[in-house]
């Protein structure tokens, strides 16, 4: 539901900014729940928070290789979905949950160790990726970024109240809702969209990430205070 409301917000912003709604929509409803969201949720709520954050991130990654590619290329390609490892990872995870299967302890421990290692790697990849991006339009980037890092947590908070969530689940949803635009939206746009669109998305990612350095600590404080 949160991603749907993020998308609606993006459509409204892009409509009034007279932008390409299809190709420039992904950065609005696909936040950086992996590179930034998972480590922050781990810091805030420990392994339980990281588990919920990883589940949200898995859904976002799946949407990257389905909806994001469809919007960027304006065509549906089943081959891309079948080639994506995230598709099979989500299927396996859902199967374990649905059939209430218990993962062998040695496998679980191995996956957990790899998961903690990946947190360091994804933070490094975030920094490297940001150095390769540039800001082409400050005004439009600021307006778009407000839609992501300001309206995002507001929508998350509203959904928490609507669904009466509490504890770490509510906190993780609020934190993940406040994340800046995902870098993967830039990479996919670079493959499928015109240069002008790629430049706009690049600008939004950089500016929203910089803005999040101010907004995330505030959201984190609220999450830990009201959803311990």
Residue ranges and their predicted role:
Residues 1-228:
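Alpha-helical transmembrane segments of multi-pass small-molecule/ion transporters
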């Amino acid at each position: 539901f949160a991603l749907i409301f993020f998308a609606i917000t993006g459509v409204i912003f892009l409509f009034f900014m007279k932008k390409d709604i299809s190709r420039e929509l992904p950065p609005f409803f696909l936040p950086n729940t992996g590179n930034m969201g998972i480590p922050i949720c781990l810091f805030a709520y420990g392994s339980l928070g990281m588990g919920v954050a990883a589940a949200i991130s898995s859904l976002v990654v799946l949407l990257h290789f389905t909806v994001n590619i469809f919007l960027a290329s304006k065509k549906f390609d089943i081959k891309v979905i079948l080639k994506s490892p995230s598709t099979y990872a989500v299927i396996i995870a859902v199967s374990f949950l649905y059939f209430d299967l218990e993962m062998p302890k040695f496998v679980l421990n191995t996956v957990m160790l790899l998961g903690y290692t990946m947190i360091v790697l994804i933070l490094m990849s975030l920094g490297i990726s940001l150095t390769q991006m540039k800001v082409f339009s400050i005004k439009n980037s600021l307006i778009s970024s407000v839609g992501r890092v300001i309206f995002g947590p507001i929508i998350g908070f509203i959904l928490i109240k609507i669904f009466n969530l509490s504890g770490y689940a509510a906190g993780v949803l609020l934190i993940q809702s406040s994340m800046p635009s995902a870098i993967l939206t830039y990479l996919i746009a670079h493959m499928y969209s015109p240069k002008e669109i790629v430049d706009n998305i690049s600008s939004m990612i950089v500016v929203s990430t910089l803005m999040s350095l101010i907004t995330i600590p505030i959201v984190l404080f609220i999450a830990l205070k009201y959803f311990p």
